[in-house]
Amino acid sequence: MATFYINGAEVTVAKKQKLLRYLRDDLHIHSAKDGCSEGACGTCTIHVDGAAVKACVLTTALAAGRNIVTVEGLPEDVREAFVYAFGAVGAVQCGFCIPGMVMAGAALIAEDPEPTEEQIKYAIRGNVCRCTGYKKIIEGISLAAAVLRGEKQIDEDLERGDDYGVGKRAFRIDVRKKVLGEGKYPDDIDELDQ
C-alpha cells in the first residue's frame, strides 16, 4: 500500500503498479500519454517533487510520500503561458508528445526562469516528437519562460484569431486541448467517454 499526492489530493493505492497505468486507468488522467511504456519517449512526463520524471518507469510503491503533478495540476499561469507560447510559435502538430514537453519545460523553468536554448534542449532530451522537429518546441518553451518572467505578454488577439489573414500567423483551433493534454487519442477513450 502506498500513499502519495496527485495534483494536491492524497491518494492511497493498494496494489503495486506502474504510476502511468494508475493515472490513466484508475484516475482517468489522460494528459500523461502512453507512447512506449518503457521510458523511451517522454510522452508520460510528470513532476515528482518538482522534477520531470517519466510516469511509465515509476511504480506506485516508489511514489509513496511523493508529490506528483500532471499538466492538470500545474498553476494556471503556467498552463496559460504554455498554451499561448506553443500556439504562437506553431509548436503543436499532432500533439501527442506535447503534454510531456510542457512538463519537461515547466520543470526547467521552475528551476531556472531564464533557460538558455542549450538548457531547453537538454531538458527535453528524453522526449520524442515525430512531427515538428524540435525547433518550434524549443522556441515555445523559451517564449513560455519569457511570459512567466513578465517580459512578454500573452497576445489575446492572436490567440482569439481576431486578425487572421493571408501571411499572418494563426493558432491551431485545437492548440489548447493538445497543450493541456485534453485532446483525445484512441488510447484516451475509455468507458467513461461512452
Describe the role of every protein-language-model region.
Residues 1-15, 30, 127, 135-137, ...:
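Cofactor-binding beta-sheet edge motifs in enzyme active sites
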Residues 8, 24, 31, 51, ...:
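Residue-level signal for pocket-adjacent positions within structured domains
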